[in-house]
């Protein structure tokens, strides 16, 4: 393979068995490789986000075949050229978990604190779980962070503690 090219491929549409197989088969038939992926069912919709690599010819094939496959399967499919991931040299990997009674604004409030300190959110997942005894909807946010090595962690922890205390949320922040 010559120089590697990269595409981010996203697909959203009604969930049904076989979608992952169909999409990964299309990528393989195009002569490309599926490197990184995130897939989930959100509501009744299947959502996919993948990093595909290959030579320029393969990337063109993924775009052409992907459009046809999306049409056939009723998926909104989008491709976008990108570059390979650069190693994060000046960042420390951390994980955060925030838990609280569900209400609008939790993701916004937490990520505003992180952005204000120059912290990059590398990945984020959230979900609702119901408390066993009360049945209360609990919101759980989990994220992988890239914290600038020059950032004073004590300041970040203090700000997160202040916000979480105001909102009655629990949080943990640890290396990883």
Question: Where are the language model's segments positioned?
Answer:
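A conserved regulatory-domain signal marking ACT and ACT-like small-molecule sensing domains
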Residues: 1-176
